[in-house]
UniProtKB/Swiss-Prot annotation:
Top-level taxon in the UniProt lineage: Eukaryota
Biotechnology: The indole alkaloid meleagrin was shown to be a good candidate to control c-Met-dependent breast cancer proliferation, migration and invasion.
Induction of its expression: Expression is decreased in presence of phenylacetic acid (PAA).
Transmembrane intervals: 36-56, 108-128, 133-153, 160-180, 191-211, 233-253, 262-282, 305-325, 338-360, 362-384, 395-415, 502-522
Inactivation phenotype: Does not affect the biosynthesis of roquefortine C and meleagrin.
InterPro entries: MFS, MFS_dom, MFS_trans_sf, Sugar_transporter_CS
Membrane topology field: Multi-pass membrane protein
UniProt entry keywords in alphabetical sequence: Membrane, Transmembrane, Transmembrane helix
Species for this entry: Penicillium rubens (strain ATCC 28089 / DSM 1075 / NRRL 1951 / Wisconsin 54-1255)
Main location as per UniProt: membrane
Protein name per Swiss-Prot or TrEMBL: Efflux pump roqT
Length: 539
């Protein structure tokens, strides 16, 4: 098949044909204003897609009241994560073969359509559908943002910009619940979704007018061959496997017993479908969603391992720390967000500093090692919180945890850009993005199971007269309002035990992230690298 040059409909600055200092392919000489404008726009886009994970949490009570849909609560969150995970790798293929700009704008359009559907829907089913559509688009936003930065900024300067994009996850995770609560109380829960529309419009405008992709050789498959290039057989096995896994983790131990046929079948299907997916990837070779030569690269699988463990640990803490503040310290949704600021400030500041360190010294390995060690210490200390722990403890422990996350969160993306040829960077970026998203989705569910089961067990030991279902349905912020004074201490101790047991998941993951750092090669981002795009013909 002939190769054609991917051109951009907008005028481009004249690029230099010489490699930049980092050894990457030539790119347009973007000026400071262009880089700053694009960075702000992309940060807003990542902020919105990250905000959608947490902003709905404080709006759910009002939504279920309006739709009388208590049974649908789990789907409001999982539907977004499911489709997000399911499309991340597929977007890697799109970014490989087609214009980064237009694939990104298409993903953003899908996300915006989903947000609009969520805002205007008159039914609970419509809300779930809107969340699914938004998740489809979200699967291509973060990886697309990283690729736009990669095509605008030289390799040795990218760590800072990559860190800025990654810090949006932390900011959104803390801002989501109080912002959702404020919008729900003062306007309507529908504005939790409408808020994405103007922000998305700004992002789209900036990307449309300021991003001029470098001249690059990309093979654009004919429409009739597009399906084979997108690995439909692999997707046929992979997408249901992810759905089965997340459903099993969400339902197991809560809605259904772990020994129930439904959960067992879901786990068995997950295993069978994943094995079939692996077989298809080996057979498809270069046309696979995950080409074996990329997955077998030790830097890629070790970075993916680091990403899934670090993000899994981080999501456990950002999900359950607000619950600890609301239940144990009687904080409102807004105040719990403020009490979470030590960790988020640490993540944001240290993410930027870590990017500078990699830029200055050229190596990400020491930063990732420090990340694993610091996160493990901070996670371990957070798991020791008691009902009478003072502010010095929960502030200090959060800072340590945030330092660990900030140091390591964006380094896997630098690994991808440093060790893979430019033609493989979209696929490698999608692999890391998928690992991060899947880590959050899986281990939030694992933490939820541990929390609910441990709370029921501990509550039975502390005070068998307390109705566990009633306490959980009452919510963390109303415990003191509805519980008799004599039952409150036992309930608080049970809450504390259950939450810190969930924190053990984060401790284990933080410790396991060390495996990824040990397996990485030491390769400087300042040295020239192989930038020849691979032939994706698969022949």
């Amino acid at each position: 098949m002939e190769k054609e040059v991917a051109t951009d409909p907008l005028p481009q600055e004249i690029p230099s044909d010489a490699p930049d200092e980092g050894g990457s392919l030539s790119r347009p000489a973007a000026n400071t204003w262009t880089v700053v404008s694009l960075t702000i726009a992309l940060c807003l886009g990542v902020f919105c897609m990250s905000l959608d994970v947490t902003i709905i949490t404080t709006a759910i009570p009002r939504i279920t009241d309006q739709f009388d849909s208590l049974d649908d609560i789990g789907w409001y969150g999982s539907s977004y994560l499911l489709t997000n995970c399911a499309t991340t790798l597929a977007f890697g293929k799109f970014y490989t073969f087609y214009s980064t700009k237009w694939v990104y704008l298409s993903a953003l359009f899908l996300f915006e359509v989903g947000s609009l559907v969520c805002g205007v829907t008159p039914t609970s089913v419509g809300l779930i559908l809107g969340r699914c559509i938004a998740g489809l688009g979200a699967g291509g936003l973060f990886s697309g943002s990283l690729l736009i930065i990669a095509q605008t900024v030289p390799l040795h300067r990218r760590p800072v910009f990559t860190a800025l994009l990654g810090s949006m996850y932390g900011i959104a995770s803390v801002a989501g619940p109080p912002l959702g609560g404020a919008l729900t109380d003062r306007v309507s829960w529908r504005w939790c979704f409408y808020i994405n529309l103007p922000i998305g419009a700004v992002t789209a405008a900036f990307v449309l007018f300021f991003f001029h992709a470098p001249n690059s050789v990309k093979r654009r498959p004919e429409l009739r061959k597009l399906l084979s290039e997108l690995d439909p057989i692999g997707s046929f096995f992979f997408l249901p496997a992810i759905v089965c896994l997340l459903l099993a983790l969400q339902w197991g131990g809560t809605q259904y017993s772990w020994k129930s046929p439904r959960i067992i079948v879901l786990f068995v299907l997950t295993g069978v479908l994943l094995l079939a997916f692996v077989a298809v990837q080996i057979r498809q070779n270069e046309k696979a969603t995950l080409p074996p030569r990329i997955v077998q690269n030790r830097n890629i699988w070790s970075s993916a391992w680091f990403a899934i463990t670090l993000n899994g640990a981080y999501f456990v803490f950002i999900y359950y720390l607000p619950i600890w503040f609301q239940a144990i310290k009687a904080a409102s949704a807004t105040k719990s967000g403020v009490m979470n600021l030590p960790s988020i400030i640490a993540v944001v500041v240290v993410s930027i500093i870590s990017g500078m360190l990699v830029t200055i010294f050229g190596y990400y390995n020491p930063v990732m090692i420090m990340s694993s060690v610091t996160l493990s210490i901070g996670a371990g200390l957070l798991s020791t919180l008691k009902t009478d722990s003072g502010s010095g403890e929960w502030i200090g422990y959060q800072i340590l945890m945030g330092l660990g996350v900030g140091l390591g969160m964006q380094q896997p993306f630098m690994v991808v850009q440093n060790v893979l040829p430019d033609g493989d960077v979209p696929t490698g970026t999608a692999v890391i993005t998928f690992a991060q998203t899947l880590g959050g989705a899986i281990f939030i569910s694992v933490g939820q199971n541990i929390f609910q089961n441990q709370f029921a067990h501990t509550m039975h030991l502390e005070d068998p007269s307390v109705n566990v279902a009633t306490v959980l349905s009452a919510g963390t912020t109303t415990l003191r309002k509805y519980l008799p004074a004599e039952q409150l201490p036992a309930v608080l101790r049970s809450y504390n035990t259950a939450i810190t047991q969930a924190f053990y998941v984060g401790v284990a993951l933080a410790s396991l992230s060390c495996i990824g750092t040990i397996a990485l090669e030491w390769k400087s981002v300042k040295k020239p690298r192989n930038t020849t795009p691979n032939d994706h013909s698969g022949s």
